[in-house]
Amino acid sequence: MLRFTEDHEWLRLEGDVATVGITRHAAEQLGDLVFVDLPKVGTTLSKGAAAAVVESVKAASDVYAPLDGEVTEANDAVVAAPETVNQDPEGAGWLYRMRLADPSSLDALMDEAAYAALPK
């Protein structure tokens, strides 16, 4: 199940763990990424709180926690090679995984059709 936020983050749910990243639109708007800072495993995130930072040649941007939960994994590959986020933002360029405090809260986020209709 793929869901999106208005802040241009995506989540893919597998069981009660969501993989989180930024959308292709966000990656294109940022330009070439040169730095990624991810949350540490075990960090408890609250919806709307800054969870990660992506920095490009244009700007630095916070990536917000889309829902409440605990970080279970960080994608160290994008820390070592930030350009992976630009090349495959909704695949190999994922940022972190989190165990959702309430998996049903995912229903409040947008599906692909609703995200596609969002003014950009």
Curated annotation (Swiss-Prot):
Disulfide-bonded cysteines: none
GO terms for biological process, alphabetical: glycine decarboxylation via glycine cleavage system
UniProt superkingdom: Bacteria
Cofactor note: Binds 1 lipoyl cofactor covalently.
Record keywords: Lipoyl
InterPro entries listed in its UniProt record: 2-oxoA_DH_lipoyl-BS, Biotin_lipoyl, GCV_H, GCV_H/Fam206, GCV_H_sub, Single_hybrid_motif
Cofactor: (R)-lipoate
Tagged with keyword Cell membrane: no
UniProt GO cellular component terms: cytosol; glycine cleavage complex
PROSITE patterns in UniProt: BIOTINYL_LIPOYL, LIPOYL
Modified residues (N6-lipoyllysine): K58
Start and end residues of each Lipoyl-binding domain: 17-99
Keyword Ribosomal protein (UniProt): no
Subunit structure, interactors included: The glycine cleavage system is composed of four proteins: P, T, L and H.
HAMAP family xref list: GcvH
Function (record text): The glycine cleavage system catalyzes the degradation of glycine. The H protein shuttles the methylamine group of glycine from the P protein to the T protein.
Family of the protein in this entry: Belongs to the GcvH family.
Name of the protein in its database record: Glycine cleavage system H protein
Gene: gcvH
